[in-house]
Regions:
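Compositionally biased non-globular segments, especially hydrophobic aliphatic-rich helices
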Residues: 10-16
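Acidic, mature catalytic/reactive cores of soluble proteins
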Residues: 16-183
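Bacterial N-terminal signal peptides
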Residues: 2-10
Length: 183
């Protein structure tokens, strides 16, 4: 049994798609953006999508960043070459329920995200089924949080949503060889 499981894991790992991370794609540009703190957190730039081919953006960056004839602004360069991630949906859910269970049941629709669309150059790993995010400011699923989310969904009778989330995990394993912390 152990050898069989090992063989299956080996096949999954070998056939898994390799995806370059933003630091691999953007190299020095990524490092400079993250260290300059032009964004309030380290996640914003990771979630930006390029307006053109990443290799062209990096080549332009390396060419002009230290050019003394150009008054270079890293923030302006990023704004011109990347689309900022959309703001999370407004969390306008304020109702007085009679009990905590009713409140939680009503939050599922606020925290639910529909299946993702692939965007070239985005770090988002698109998921084929709807899922629940761990809170209002989040745009993606998180592996560890999903366990506790599914426990809550089970208590609420949301079995279809649990199935979608498990199908997303299956998809991630088949495509990437593992379930990353976030998609």
């Amino acid at each position: 049994l152990f050898l069989f499981l090992f063989a299956i894991q080996t096949v999954i790992t070998v056939s898994a798609q390799k995806v370059q991370t933003p630091d691999q794609v953007y190299g020095q540009l990524f490092k400079d953006v993250q260290l300059s703190r032009i964004f309030p957190d380290n996640k914003t730039f990771v979630d930006c999508t390029p307006k053109r081919k990443p290799a062209a953006i990096v080549a332009d960056y390396l060419k002009i960043k230290n050019n003394p004839a150009i008054r270079f602004s890293l923030k302006l360069f990023v704004e011109e070459n990347f689309t900022m991630p959309p703001a999370p949906p407004a969390f306008n859910y304020i109702q007085k329920e009679k009990d905590v269970a009713a409140h939680i049941n009503n939050l599922w629709s606020v925290l639910k995200r529909e299946k993702d669309k692939a965007v070239e150059g985005s770090s988002l790993l698109p998921l084929p089924h709807p899922y629940i995010v761990p809170g209002g400011r989040f745009r993606e699923i998180y592996y560890w949080d999903s366990y506790f989310t599914m426990l809550g969904l089970k208590e609420s009778g949301e079995t279809a949503t649990i199935k979608h989330m498990l199908d997303n995990f299956k998809f991630l394993i088949e495509k990437y060889g593992h379930i990353p912390n976030g998609n």
